[in-house]
Amino acid sequence: MLHIYNTLSRTKETFKPVHAGEVRIYVCGMTVYDYCHLGHARMLVAFDVVQRWLRASGYAVNYVRNITDIDDKIIRRAVQTGRRMHEVTDYFIAAMHADERALAVERPDHEPRATAYVGEMIDIIGRLEKNGLAYQADDGDVNYAVRGFQGYGKLSGKSLDDLRAGERVAVGSSKRDPLDFVLWKSAKEEEPPETKWDSPYGFGRPGWHIECSAMSKSLLGLPLDIHGGGPDLKFPHHENEIAQTEGAFGGTLANIWMHCGPLMVDAEKMSKSLGNFRTIRQTIAQGEAQDGEADYQANPREAEMLRFFIVRNHYRSPQNYTPDNLVDAQNALDRLYQALANVTPDVAGIDWNEAQAQAFKAAMNDDFNSSGAVAALFELAGQVNRERDSRAAGQLKALGAVLGLLQQDPAVYFQSSTRYSSAGMQQGASQMDAARIEALIAERGQAKLSRDFARADAIRAELRAAGIELDDKPGGMTQWRRA
């Protein structure tokens, strides 16, 4: 039975879809004005794993991930580069799809562009106005009257009083309340014509939040089974989505809300101002990815390493990007592939009665705990290495496929060079050096102190697959030996 952590209730809940056997998922996607960065990679891979597991569990999944193709940042990019808005968005959508292919992220069932749903957005604004939740200000903008919606803040846990204390009304603002947010932006004379739509409120364009309310309702209906997104979307974007959709139609927008954890760079938030901003293509391109070319050739070994780096951590846990962590991920993935290189897999399919398949299933049914699932993969790799067991190798490859991993031919995989492999590392599992073993043991100790037992188990399994046995002693000490 599947259990999912619900951001709304702040608890794990037994998953019960609205319609038996069917799952409707809406995930907030990209605003396409630049290349996708590593934080985007985490969101893309995390929800790809979610939909893969739901399908593997027998559900009929309708997965929608939108594209925001009208936004102030897009308009600025178009003006700065002398291009039309759709030229900017078409280019970066193509670039995003190139990143997804490299990371083995499956395309969603629907990938709506916001500009195709402006009519539906205007309809929702009209409903909100009729319900007393929207008003047109003196400057022509249409704003949402936040205090008119009972329950605002229920997702983020923020009270109106707390929000009010941190807000200030901008000079010249015609909002009735500083908490109000824009639903429809009135057109400015200097803005390009293609950014303006006619409406009952005059020419203008939609606000960001209203876009997702329109697309999710139009494509999936209400309530959604699952609504997901990145960690920074909980407030205000998702909070505002709830206010819009429920304020317009009543009922519930989504039964379960999922948010993946942040991806940090050297323990700091990734930002261009800090100089630690890194795109997906910078990380995995074969050679230098050329600016101005949406498509690129990814290094297949490095690309799967980046996916593995994300999958080996629980989707809700914070994740830290460092060069050393990528080396660690590459070495670990190499060990899984080495097990498959040593023994030809029996391709009979998954035997769900087998112990490690059961462990894998239990982990994934526990809030999509891919870290625990990866631990099961390392247990199987250890079995393959010890026993030269072709059925275990088949299980390893088949379960890896559920996570979008281990589908390359091992011989071809190892023919690709990698920038993220330890100097002098031998491919054989038994060649892990003492310094690396001690580092993993220290990381395991920290994981246990943080009560991240899935990660601790995954490290033990990884070491066992490399032929390293651990012996935990009283007082927190751990000794190791080569098997």
UniProtKB/Swiss-Prot annotation:
Q: Does the keyword Zinc apply?
A: yes
| A Gene Ontology term for the protein's cellular component | cytosol
Q: Where does Zn(2+) bind?
A: 28, 212, 237, 241
Chain span(s) of sequence motif 'KMSKS' region: 269-273
User: What EC number(s) has UniProt assigned to this enzyme?
Assistant: 6.1.1.16
Tell me its cofactors.
Answer: Zn(2+)
| Keyword match Amino-acid biosynthesis | no
Catalytic activity line of the entry: tRNA(Cys) + L-cysteine + ATP = L-cysteinyl-tRNA(Cys) + AMP + diphosphate
The note on the cofactor says: Binds 1 zinc ion per subunit.
Localization, UniProt: Cytoplasm
* A GO molecular function held by the record: ATP binding
Q: Which GO terms describe its biological process?
A: cysteinyl-tRNA aminoacylation
Motif ('HIGH' region) positions are: 30-40
Q: Which UniProt keywords apply?
A: Aminoacyl-tRNA synthetase, ATP-binding, Cytoplasm, Ligase, Metal-binding, Nucleotide-binding, Protein biosynthesis, Zinc
Q: Where does ATP bind?
A: 272
User: Superkingdom, according to UniProt?
Assistant: Bacteria
Spell out the family assignment given in the record's similarity comment. Answer: Belongs to the class-I aminoacyl-tRNA synthetase family.
Oligomer and partners:
Monomer.
Q: Which PANTHER family match?
A: CYSTEINE--TRNA LIGASE, CYTOPLASMIC (PTHR10890:SF3), CYSTEINYL-TRNA SYNTHETASE (PTHR10890)
Q: What is this protein called?
A: Cysteine--tRNA ligase
Gene name per UniProt: cysS
